[in-house]
Amino acid sequence: MLSDREVLSTLEMLKNEHLDVRTVTLGVSLFDCAGHDPEKFKENVQRKIFRLAGNLVKVCDEIGIRYGIPVVNKRVAVSPIAVAACSFSRPQMVEVARKLDETAADIGIDFIGGFGALVEKGFTEGDRALIAAIPEALASTRRVCSSVNVASTRAGINMDAVYLMGKTIKDAAELTREADGIACAKLCVFANIPEDVPFMAGAYLGVGEPDSVINVGVSGPGVVKKAIDRARAANPHLDLGALSDIIKRTSFKVTRVGELIGRQVAEKLGVPFGVVDLSLAPTPNVGDSVGEIFQSLGLQSIGVPGTTAALALLNDAVKKGGAFASSYVGGLSGAFIPVSEDLNIAAAASRGYLSMEKLEAMTSVCSVGLDMVALAGDTSAETLAGIIADEMAIGVINKKTTAARLIPVPGKKAGEKASFGGLLGEAVIIAVSSNFGSREFISLGGRIPAPIHSLIN
């Protein structure tokens, strides 16, 4: 039986604490669209996305109005294009990206993900063509997002792919020089990428997924912060164990909301419901910040000593509460630390509290730590590859998802600001300890073997 206080607290979440469903993402398999004729492939892709996702925005809006819970982003994730369009050349891959962008605009969605490849153990010709197409594809489209998986606990780290992605990021930044390298904001490099991520830029539909499926990403950092603030105001002597329990209970409510909306949308569209991703996703709006949660837990700012421990507490409590609320939890399900997309985190970086090394340390206990990190425009491809390799190693050794979304901002140096607009926000450019110290190591290439604990059979 719900108490009056619980009902009122849920209403307060909706009214004043920015509770919403951050994204409803429809996965669409493109494998039945495959063929050797690029024009026919593009036609098949457009027709299938229209058929399955044509009413996605309308249905999400209707369900949101019915329950008073806004769905902020409506998105589509498709099969990895490097697989579905494996016989195509680089220019043909670019044309596929443009068709995806056109289709996304026609149906009114925010982003379309899946322009990516899975290369943790090596490349096919389709993989090489797609990765070569990424800079032009992202620079010439608005809604297309790309993700490339270069490592896994079972395969190790493909260092040739890591180096190639360092070069790709540089090229993508240069092609969008006038917009602070914004193409890189739509490109994510992964280790252990899940097949059901609803969040961009990592979303794609895995090969083991249904023909179509709804996956939901919840929100709620503002809700968690307010819950902690209320509890500490009522009882200043609460310890971290008690605060963890409060976060857990709040996460339960947030996840219940996400699953309710997701299932209603799936039923209305006539497709299966997949998972709820439990990641707390911030925005650049006041009161919707993951960074502010750390201050509510007693830290002066995110980035000071104790930050990684606080993040571990937060991540664990959110997972425990969310897992109890939903039978199907998936995606990344770990706190995001997107530097430019969170006002508080961006401010901490500009004040010097957040270094590259601290962000990397935080990644060991969350899913995406080097996220929307702006770097100096002269950062070399080898240095980018070294940063990516470090991030991949954390994921591979700890059997978890990690990712890097790095933005070398052309023409700007550490300490200057980069602005990406909208949900992508703005951030100070973070310094890197050395720009050329990784060159020899990265140029060796090859594959770093999988760790011994990958042998689990």
UniProtKB/Swiss-Prot annotation:
Domain of life: Bacteria
Residue ranges the record marks as coiled coil: none
Database matches in SUPFAM superfamilies: PFL-like glycyl radical enzymes
Family membership noted in the UniProt record: Belongs to the UPF0210 family.
Binding partners and assembly: Homodimer.
Protein's name in the database: UPF0210 protein Sfum_2948
Species this protein is from: Syntrophobacter fumaroxidans (strain DSM 10017 / MPOB)
Organism taxonomic ancestry: Bacteria, Pseudomonadati, Thermodesulfobacteriota, Syntrophobacteria, Syntrophobacterales
